[in-house]
Swiss-Prot record:
Gene3D superfamilies: Tetratricopeptide repeat domain (1.25.40.10). Pfam families: PPR, PPR_2. PPR repeats lie at residues 101-135, 136-166, 173-207, 208-242, 243-276, 277-311, 312-342, 343-373. GO terms for cellular component: mitochondrion. Residues 1-14 form a transit peptide. PANTHER family: OS07G0661900 PROTEIN. Keywords: Mitochondrion, Repeat, Transit peptide. This is Pentatricopeptide repeat-containing protein At2g18520, mitochondrial. Belongs to the PPR family. P subfamily. NCBIfam families: PPR.
Length: 418
C-alpha cells in the first residue's frame, strides 16, 4: 500500500514538474543510452534529469545502464535536497516485477546511498524477505556501498561482522572486503586496512588491484610514504596487474615533490605499456602549479584532448592565486562550454579577482553562467556573494543579461547539445 501511494506521488510530481503525461515518452525524440548518459552528466535541473531518466529506464534492458541512470538522477535530486522525491522515485520501483531480482533491488539500495539516505537503504535491505527477493552477498555489497556513499565509515565494520552471522546466505567476497578496506582508509586508518588485507591473504580471499590501490593512496595521504613504497614493491613482486589508476596514485604523491619526479613516473608508465591519461597529466600540471610555473602548467592543459573537471578546477584556482585572472576567465569559459565548470570555491576566487580588478562585466558574466550550472542550494549562496561584491541589484539586471561573453558561451553550449 505504501509503495503504491509513493508511486502515485512520483507520477503526480513527475507530471507536474515536466508538464508531460506519465504514460508518454518523457524526453522529446528517441534518446540512445549514450546520449542519455551524456545529458544526465550535463544537466543540473532535477526535473530535466527525471524526464531523461524516465525515457531510459523504460527502454533500457541493461542493468548496469539502468543503475547508472538511476544513480545520476538521484544525485541531481539530492543536490537540490529533494529527498521526498528521491524516496517516491525509488519506492515506486517496488511495483516493478523485477523487484524479485536481487540485482534490480540492489540498484535501489545503492541509489539511496547516493543520496546519503542510509536508513532507507537499510530498510529496503530488511524488506527483501517480504518482497520475495533472495538475499546474498550481492545485496549485502550494495548495502555496504550505500554506507560508504553516506560517509558512515564506522558502520561498515559493524555490518561486516554482524550480517554474515545473521543471514546464512551472506558470505563476504573480495568486493565486500574491498569496501571494508575502503571504510578504514576513508576514516584515516590505513594500518587497519593493511591488517584486513593480511587477513584476506590468510583466508585465501583475492586482494584485488582496487584494494591495493585504495590502501596505497591512503598511506600516501596520511604521510606514510615509506609504508606506501614498501606496499608498492610488494605489489610489483607479486605480479599485480598494475594499471593507470594505481600509477596515478603514485603520481598524486609525486606531484608534491616536483614536476621532474612526475615526469619520471610517467616515463615508467610508458615503459610498462601504459599510456598516461588525463588524470596523469593533471598531476603534472598540478606539480607545475605548485612551483608557480604557470606557463608550463598551461602548456600541459593546452595539450590535453579531453580535460576533465579537475583539470579546470586546478588550473583556474592556481591562475587566480597567481593573479592571472584574465587567463583564468578564458579557461573558465572553456569549462562552461564543455559542461565542466569548477566548484563554488574556485568560481568565487575568480569572481572576486575580476571585481578587484574592476572587471565587473566579466564578473557578472561568470555569475550568470554559475547560476545556470549550479544546483539551487548553491545558487542561493552564490546570490549572497553577488550582493557582497556589488554585482547584483535591480539596476544592473539589464547589464547582466546583455553580457556578450556570457551569450557567447551559452550559445556554444546549445550548439553542443544538438
Amino acid at each position: 500500500m505504501t509503495s503504491s501511494r509513493l508511486y502515485l506521488r512520483f507520477l503526480r510530481r513527475f507530471s507536474t514538474a515536466t508538464g508531460i503525461d506519465s504514460q508518454t515518452t518523457a524526453y522529446p525524440g528517441a534518446i540512445t543510452m549514450s546520449k542519455a548518459k551524456s545529458k544526465l552528466r550535463k544537466v543540473q535541473d532535477p526535473d530535466k534529469a527525471l524526464a531523461i531518466y524516465k525515457s531510459v529506464s523504460n527502454n533500457s534492458t541493461s542493468p548496469l545502464s539502468s543503475r547508472y541512470a538511476m544513480e545520476l538522477t538521484v544525485q541531481r535530486l539530492a543536490k537540490s535536497q529533494r529527498f521526498s522525491d528521491i524516496e517516491a522515485l525509488i519506492e515506486s520501483h517496488k511495483n516493478n516485477p523485477k523487484i524479485k531480482t536481487e540485482t534490480f533491488l540492489s540498484t535501489l539500495i545503492r541509489s539511496y546511498g547516493r543520496a546519503s539516505m542510509f536508513d532507507h537503504a537499510m530498510k529496503m535491505f530488511e524488506e527483501m524477505d517480504k518482497l520475495g527477493t533472495p538475499r546474498t552477498v550481492v545485496s549485502f555489497n550494495a548495502l555496504l556501498a550505500a554506507c560508504l556513499h553516506s560517509d558512515l565509515f564506522e558502520r561498515v565494520p559493524q555490518l561486516f561482522d554482524e550480517f554474515p552471522q545473521r543471514y546464512n546466505n551472506i558470505t563476504p567476497d573480495k568486493i565486500s572486503y574491498g569496501m571494508l578496506i575502503k571504510s578504514y582508509c576513508d576514516s584515516g586508518k590505513p594500518e587497519k586496512a593493511m591488517e584486513i588485507m593480511r587477513d584476506m591473504e590468510v583466508k585465501g580471499v583475492e586482494v584485488t588491484i582496487i584494494a591495493f590501490t585504495t590502501i596505497l593512496g591512503s598511506l600516501y595521504k596520511n604521510g606514510l610514504v615509506d609504508e606506501a613504497e614498501s606496499l608498492w614493491i610488494e605489489m610489483v613482486n607479486k605480479g599485480c596487474d598494475l594499471d593507470n589508476t594505481v600509477y596515478n596514485v603514485r603520481l598524486m604523491n609525486a606531484a608534491k615533490e616536483s614536476p621532474e619526479r612526475v615526469k619520471e613516473l610517467m616515463e615508467e608508465m610508458s615503459s610498462v605499456g601504459l599510456k598516461p591519461d588525463t588524470v596523469s597529466y593533471n598531476y603534472l600540471m598540478t606539480a607545475y602549479c605548485v612551483k608557480g610555473m604557470m606557463s608550463e602548467a598551461k602548456k600541459v592543459y593546452e595539450g590535453l584532448e579531453q580535460p576533465n573537471a579537475a583539470t579546470f578546477r586546478t588550473l583556474i584556482f592556481h591562475l587566480c592565486i597567481n593573479g592571472l585572472y584574465d587567463q583564468g576567465l578564458t579557461v573558465f569559459k572553456k569549462s562552461a562550454i564543455v559542461h565542466k565548470i569548477p566548484d563554488f570555491k574556485t568560481c568565487k576566487h575568480l569572481t572576486e579577482g575580476l571585481v578587484k580588478n574592476n572587471r565587473m562585466e566579466d564578473a557578472r558574466g561568470v555569475a550568470r553562467i554559475v547560476k545556470k550550472k549550479f544546483p539551487p542550494r548553491l545558487v542561493t549562496e552564490w546570490k549572497k556573494l553577488e550582493e557582497k561584491l556589488g554585482l547584483y541589484s535591480k539596476g544592473n539586471a539589464a547589464a547582466v543579461s546583455s553580457s556578450s561573453q556570457t551569450r557567447e558561451v551559452l550559445d556554444q553550449e546549445r550548439e553542443d547539445d544538438v
